[in-house]
Structures are given as C-alpha cells and as structure tokens.
Amino acid sequence: MKIDIVSVFPEYFEVMNLSLMGKAQAKGLLEIKAHNLRDWTHDVHHSVDDTPVGGGAGMVMKPEVWSECLDELLGFSQPSGSPAPSGAPVLIFPNPSAPLFTQRDATELSHADHLLFGCGRYEGYDARIPDYYRAQGVDVREYSIGDYVLNGGEVAVSVMLEAITRLMPGFMGNPDSIVEESYTGEGALLEHRQYTKPAVWRGIAVPDVLLSGDHGKVDRFRRDEALARTAEIRPDLIAALDCKALDKADRKTLMALGWEVSAAHPRRLAD
C-alpha cells in the first residue's frame, strides 16, 4: 500500500518508522511519504492560511495551496475541471464535524492500494476543497475520530493509519491476534478482559476457569464476558446484533443481563 500524507509538520510522521509500522515498510508492505504543504506556496512567508470569509476567530487553510498540492499527488495532468485519473488514491481528511471513523471503515480502507491523507490546522481547511475533488470523481472521505477537537489533523491521521494498516495481510506477526479484538466482525462486541501470569497478583486472582485447561469453558467464559462488558459499556452494539446469529448460550446470557432476544435485534427490557 502506498500512503501519502500532507501536513505543515511532516516531521510528525517520523514515528511511522518505529515498531510494526517500520517493519512493514522494511518488508515492502507499506510505502509512507509525508509532504510539507508549504512546498506548494509561492510567497516569501510560505503562507497556507487566511482569515475566514464572513468573519470569526482563527484562520482557514487556503484552497489555492491545497489544490496545487493535491493536483500533483492525485496525478491531475490538467487540473482545471479534469476528471480524476485512473488509479487515483482515496483522499482522506480528518474533520471533527464528519462521520465517526469506525473499524468497518478501517477494514474497507485496508484493501486500498493508495491512500492520501490531508492534515488540517487552525480552523480547518476551506470547505470547497473536498467538494471540488468529489466533483472531479475522486473518492473523498472525511472522518472524525471522536467528539473532541485537536490542534491539527496529524494525530487523527496517525490513529486512522494505524487502524487501517494493521489489518493488512502480513502486517501483524500473529494474524490471529486481530480476530477476537473489539469491534471486529459482523457481530462486533468489546473484547473480553485479558490476564497473564502470575495467577494471583496482589491478592487478585485470575478467574479459575481460565486455569482449567477446558478450552470450551474458556471460550464460553470469554464470550459471556464480552457480551456483559458490551452490554454495560456499549449497549448500542448489543442492540445491533442479529438475534438469529446468537446461539442458545448467548441468548441465555443476554436474557440474564436484562435483554429481550425474541425479535430481530436484542432490546433492553427496561427500554
């Protein structure tokens, strides 16, 4: 996968040379390049922002600078009104006002050949930028990573990039480690809690069933704990489950937790 990142702080992404991300690049699974947006400016101050039209606090990133940068990285030979070239990357902007980035999005994007991330700063980028490239046929995505605001898009891009790339074949040393993670699969649940040795630490014991050696009982315990944790922390995920996909033990656990499971989707009895 080829990944281009545009930022006014490209050095922020030197961290991508560490750990599994660095190993993936060394193996040729990833090609990551960070670009400095200021390289496409023409004034002595290398300005990338201007005051907001209509007034207001802060500064807004200028479309002229972004368009020169994106035209080049997207492969537009004739920028004005030309359609997106074949094989153009998916263009992704972090935006706190956009739909939430989810594991489903990460899974979809992990199959892409080329991703281009644009990191906003200040009050953000001119709203016409994503609109323009959508109109040219580019696959433009805008995502939020949560209900909060950051100083810039670099942190959000790092979060999305790690969530996406770790799903690529060959990225993880043990591919089985992602199978039972939180939010994974159609019947997405929060993952069960994890323990390691010693069996008793500071007076707190690992659940006995995990030491039993009975893999069936261990699997059931973990499944029940995942259902219980999800019901408590993210009941919306329980409500999205398909009751037809639940086995008898799942139904029994959910009923004990106060959920009705006779309809298409579980429903809390208190609702």
From Swiss-Prot:
**Where found in the cell?**
Cytoplasm
Q: Which SUPFAM superfamilies match?
A: alpha/beta knot
User: What name does this protein carry?
Assistant: tRNA (guanine-N(1)-)-methyltransferase
Record's catalysed reaction(s)? guanosine(37) in tRNA + S-adenosyl-L-methionine = N(1)-methylguanosine(37) in tRNA + S-adenosyl-L-homocysteine + H(+)
Q: Which UniProt keywords apply?
A: Cytoplasm, Methyltransferase, S-adenosyl-L-methionine, Transferase, tRNA processing
| Function as written in the Swiss-Prot or TrEMBL entry | Specifically methylates guanosine-37 in various tRNAs.
Domain of life per record: Bacteria
InterPro entries assigned: Alpha/beta_knot_MTases, tRNA_m1G_MeTrfase_C_sf, tRNA_m1G_MeTrfase_TrmD, tRNA_m1G_MTases_N, tRNA_MeTrfase_TRMD/TRM10
Pfam annotation, one family: tRNA_m1G_MT
One GO term (biological process): tRNA N1-guanine methylation
Q: Indicate the family of this protein.
A: Belongs to the RNA methyltransferase TrmD family.
Provide the residue positions that the database annotates as binding S-adenosyl-L-methionine: 120, 145-150
Q: Name one GO cellular component term.
A: cytosol
Q: Is Repeat one of the keywords?
A: no
Any GO molecular function: tRNA (guanine(37)-N1)-methyltransferase activity
